[in-house]
UniProtKB/Swiss-Prot annotation:
HAMAP family: Enolase (MF_00318). Mg(2+) binds at residues 241, 283, 310. The keyword Cytoplasm applies. It is found in: Cytoplasm; Secreted; Cell surface. It catalyses: (2R)-2-phosphoglycerate = phosphoenolpyruvate + H2O. Pfam families: Enolase_C, Enolase_N. This is Enolase. GO terms for molecular function: magnesium ion binding; phosphopyruvate hydratase activity.
Length: 428
């Protein structure tokens, strides 16, 4: 037994200078752990609700109410429970909140407690977090989906697509994939400089040049890959996070690259891109409630490319179940703060994998030095992780943790590589 004895919380800052919640847990055997909660810039309508203070302090974004929720309600609800009984702990958290969207105590308060308990239990068990959560077979290192060019809500430019990513699919190890990604990142900076484009950074460490559109951005990245001596499509593939909900409105549809488009027109554009570039993944290509559009797009190109539901599914097993029944998307983006507890996150991943959906573990644009998602990516065998460019310490912290995990696993480690993606699975 490893009984939860004390629970504490504080307000800290995330990578964008906004407040977030950090929770600490002490067990009766002396084991101690803390967890910090991320937050997003582009958030889905169906996400669990963060508790923010409002008012003038921190522009209304303070989290003193969430901290107080941890201290006054969450702590009494979980103190005395065995920390290794994660499902019991998380159910106690859900019962204490009592709302379907976690809006009373706040998903940020609940998640901080949930993750801190898991970390403390791992410490008490003498196991790394990935091993504690994932069991004896956790051994697959994810492909890093590096967001090296930022647009949309992550940058103050005219580029509508939110993230342009590189995926080092041809590497033999995670260590090699990280090096390849970093080399492409630095090569892209030199390409941008040569063309007189800005090299300032967006929220997630990627460059934020004001380029003409999607194809120009993909072309710039393709040139950067070639500049490193790596082979586009074989060594390094491309991926997008469109975040289409950000430019969709009822009545006018998708306002994209200067014109209003229908779901069918957006789908035709994606089909054209997938044929022209080695794109392995497109996240949120359509609005979070455009189920008909998603189903049609999945039928059209789902056998060629990974179609990832982020705002569509919000890591919620009920939303995912609906998507599976309808045949919408073929992959789930996993963000722990969208759903609010570790148990619900693991349930969503399990549901996805049992139904043939791929999963991609993900950070948020407002991150901290917390490395939990690196361990979770290995624990659940997701095969993919999205945690920004190889720049800014809150992003690099996750990559460095994966290096440690790969080293820890030794000969047992396996890098997911190209088989993580439907494009290659369908090609055989």
């Amino acid at each position: 037994m490893s009984i939860i004895e004390q629970v504490g919380a504080r307000e800290i800052l995330d990578s964008r200078g906004n407040p977030t919640v950090e929770v600490e847990v002490l067990l009766d055997d002396g084991s101690f752990a803390r967890a910090a909660v991320p937050s997003g810039a582009s958030t889905g309508e169906h996400e669990a609700v963060e508790l923010r203070d409002g008012g003038d302090r921190y522009g209304g974004k303070g989290v003193e109410k969430a901290v107080e929720a941890v201290l006054s309600e969450i702590a009494p609800a979980i103190i005395g429970i065995d920390a290794t009984e994660q499902r019991t702990v998380d159910q106690a958290l859900l019962d204490a909140d009592g709302t379907p969207d976690k809006s009373r105590l706040g998903a940020n308060a609940l998640l901080g407690a949930s993750l801190a308990v898991a970390r403390a239990a791992a410490e008490s068990s003498g196991l790394d977090l990935f091993r504690y959560v994932g069991g004896p077979n956790a051994h697959v290192l994810p492909v890093p989906m590096m967001n090296i060019l930022n647009g949309g809500a992550h940058a103050d430019t005219g580029v509508d697509v939110q993230e342009f990513m590189v995926a080092p699919i041809g590497a033999a190890t995670f260590k090699e994939s990280l090096r390849w990604g970093a080399e492409v990142y630095h090569a892209l900076k030199s390409v941008l400089k040569e063309k007189g484009l800005a090299t300032g950074l967006g929220d997630e460490g990627g460059f934020a040049p004001d380029v003409a559109g999607t194809k120009e951005a993909l072309d710039l990245i393709s040139v950067a890959i070639g500049k490193t001596g790596l082979v586009l499509g074989t060594d390094v593939a491309l991926a997008l996070d469109v975040a289409a909900t950000e430019f969709y409105t009822d009545g006018t549809g998708y306002k994209f690259e200067g014109s209003n488009r229908t779901a069918a027109e957006m789908s035709a554009f994606y089909a054209e891109l997938v044929d022209a570039y080695p794109i392995v993944s497109i996240e949120d290509p359509l609005d979070e409630d455009d189920w008909d559009g998603w189903v049609a797009l999945t039928d059209q190109i789902g056998n060629k490319v990974q179609l990832v539901g982020d705002d569509l599914f919000v890591t919620n097993p009920e939303r995912l179940e609906e998507g599976i029944v309808k045949g919408a998307a073929n992959a789930l983006l996993v963000k722990v703060n969208q759903i609010g507890t570790l148990t619900e996150t693991l349930d969503a991943v399990d549901l996805a994998h049992r139904n043939g959906y791929k999963t991609m573990m993900s950070h948020r644009s407002g991150e901290t030095e917390d490395t939990t998602i690196a361990d979770l990516a290995v624990a659940v065998g997701s095969g993919q992780i999205k945690t920004g460019a190889p720049a800014r310490s809150e992003r690099v912290a996750k990559y460095n943790q994966l290096l440690r995990i790969e080293e820890n696993l030794g000969d047992a480690a396996r890098y997911a590589g190209e088989v993580a993606f439907p494009r290659f699975a369908f090609e055989g």
